[in-house]
Amino acid sequence: MIRILTDSASDILPAEASQLGVDVIPLNVTLEDGTVIRDGVDLTPSEYYEHMAGCKKLPTTSQPSPELFEKFYAEAAAAGDEVVGIFLSHELSGTYQCAKLAADLANVDNVLFVDSTNVCLGEGLLVRLAAHLRDEGKSAVQIAATLEHAKEHLHLVAAIDDLKYLRKGGRLPAAVAVAGGMLGIKPLITIKEGKVAMAGKARGLPGAYVALFKKIEELGGVNPRFPSLAGYTISTREVNPIQTYLVDNLGLSEPLVRQIGCVIGTHAGPGAFGLAFFDNGLVID
């Protein structure tokens, strides 16, 4: 059997993980009072954002312990199963390296690793693709190879209400954050070579949607042969214009809609929304 493993930065919550047949190792979030919660397990995203709104100090995030990975690998090996692990970009977290180190510590060779070079919605799309390929009967080697190909055509574009969260979390240079936050500008970000990068700026919320749609087209458009994934932090209303754009303007299927989880929400901040998609250049045999 092939087991699909990911981390909670993919924002696949337990109920959906069970439905997809994938396993999720949670990252950790340390709250202002020192309480450590497991991402996607101990608090719902909505509960977390409510707590975050009252924080004077930004919560911190940390990778899982190697022991969690070791235990999973050992159980899979004992059952004779192979593992395909898909993790958030190594440029943004030590989780990928931690997952690989754990395989060495567990002395197993049944794990194939995929650095998504993405995060959140983008990482989640790769995990869903992996589950689909497994259900089609592909081998672990075939799944990993297809994901390596697919991630070259994977994009995440998001509008951020305030870049201060990314700056405080160390995911964006201070000078870029200041420039993006000037004069009521709504900055757009993307993931480029595994890192957070500025993708544009717009004035006000309507302008942010227009800029986001323009960037999507610049990146190759939304491939109708694969699902897309829209994400929000506070309210589903944040993604309504994205749904309208895809369905009414482009004639595409509605995107999947998911709430952005605690780890990524810590850095993106309240009011963030975006879309992950595969571009029209992706072809999978």
Task: Enumerate the predicted regions with their spans.
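Short, contiguous strand/loop micro-motifs
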Residues: 1, 59-60, 86, 117, ...
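Mixed-charge interfacial surface used for oligomerization/domain docking
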Residues: 3, 9-23, 28-30, 34-35, ...
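Class I S-adenosyl-L-methionine
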Residues: 35-85, 89-108
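Local beta-strand N-terminus motif with an aromatic residue
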Residues: 1-2, 80
